[in-house]
From Swiss-Prot:
This is Large ribosomal subunit protein bL21. Keywords: Ribonucleoprotein, Ribosomal protein, RNA-binding, rRNA-binding. SUPFAM superfamilies: L21p-like. HAMAP family: Ribosomal_bL21 (MF_01363). The lineage of its organism: Bacteria, Pseudomonadati, Pseudomonadota, Alphaproteobacteria, Hyphomicrobiales. InterPro entries: bL21-like, bL21-like_sf, Ribosomal_bL21. Belongs to the bacterial ribosomal protein bL21 family. The gene is rplU.
Length: 157
């Protein structure tokens, strides 16, 4: 069975256990990703073409790793202008392994998702006695003549 999925502005023909590289998908290695934008599903001569997507079809994939593609050099030269510019770009890509292709509204198998998220501990209650009040210092505003007097006194010392 094969499927045509849409991700990252491109279309990919995939089969089960296929490894492919796509535009970056947020996630860590071991995470499971579900693609619901299935444009076509087929097996042998039988094919179901969506308009634009196939209803109740999905493709489940596992993220193998995150990496960067080879550097693409962009070079511009303006002749007789003594002007040139070289730039490089490395696109971030995700390597996926297709786990299963589901059609007809079948439920996905419960997949174990490895997550590095730590559960947030409940905030501790703070007793009112332990909270200290901050001391506030009030400063009296001085006018210009007082500032001049204070400056002249500091020079005398």
């Amino acid at each position: 069975m094969f499927a045509v999925i849409k991700t990252g502005g491109k279309q990919y023909r995939v089969v089960a256990n296929q490894v492919l590289k796509v535009e970056k998908i947020v996630g860590n290695a071991g995470d499971v990703v579900n693609f619901s934008d299935v444009l076509m599903v087929g097996e042998g001569d039988n094919a179901i073409i969506g308009a634009p997507i196939v209803a109740d079809a999905s493709v489940t994939a596992e993220i193998i790793g995150q990496e960067r593609a080879r550097k693409v050099i962009s070079f511009k030269k303006r002749r007789r202008q003594n002007s040139k510019r070289t730039r490089g770009h490395r696109q971030e890509i995700t390597t996926l392994r297709i786990v299963e292709i589901l059609t007809g509204g079948l439920k996905t198998k419960t997949a174990t998702v490895k997550s590095n998220e730590k559960k947030a501990a409940a905030p501790k209650e703070v007793k009112a006695d332990s909270v200290k009040e901050t001391a506030t210092k009030t400063v009296k505003k001085r006018n210009v003549s007082q500032k001049v007097e204070a400056a002249s006194e500091s020079k005398k010392d």
